[in-house]
C-alpha cells in the first residue's frame, strides 16, 4: 500500500469511531486525527498542518478529500491537492479555490489510485 488513508475531523474521537463503525469502514484508515485535543477547528489553517507535522511530508504530497466545499477550499488554499467528494451532484460554492478533481464517491478514489 503506497498511500496512507487518514481521517482529519472536527469531530470527537467517539463520533468518528461511531461513523467508521456504522459505515463499515473499520480497518480502512491508517490513522484518525481529531482536533478534539488541540481545540482548533477547520477551516483554521493550523488544523491542516497537523498531518503535515505528524507525517513529515510536503503539502503537495497530500491529497485532501472532503464532501464540504468550504473544507476543500480551505485545504486547497493551505496547499493541499484538494479533492471534492460530490455525492449529490451539487454545484461547488463560489469560493476562492476550486478542487483539483471532483469524484462521486470513495470508489472513484480507489479507481484513481
Question: Could you describe each region identified by the protein language model?
Answer:
Residues 8-13, 17-113:
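Asp-based, Mg2+/Mn2+-dependent phosphohydrolase catalytic module
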Amino acid at each position: 500500500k503506497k498511500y496512507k488513508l487518514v481521517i482529519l475531523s472536527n469531530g470527537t474521537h467517539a463520533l468518528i469511531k461511531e461513523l467508521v463503525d456504522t459505515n463499515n469502514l473499520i480497518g480502512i484508515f491508517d490513522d484518525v486525527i481529531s482536533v478534539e485535543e488541540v481545540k482548533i477547528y477547520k477551516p483554521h489553517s493550523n488544523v491542516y498542518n497537523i498531518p503535515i507535522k505528524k507525517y513529515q511530508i510536503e503539502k503537495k504530497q497530500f491529497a485532501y478529500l472532503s464532501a464540504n466545499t468550504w473544507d476543500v477550499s480551505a485545504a486547497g488554499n493551505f496547499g493541499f491537492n484538494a479533492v471534492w467528494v460530490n455525492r449529490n451532484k451539487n454545484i461547488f460554492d463560489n469560493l476562492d479555490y476550486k478542487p483539483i478533481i471532483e469524484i462521486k464517491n470513495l470508489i472513484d478514489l480507489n479507481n484513481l489510485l
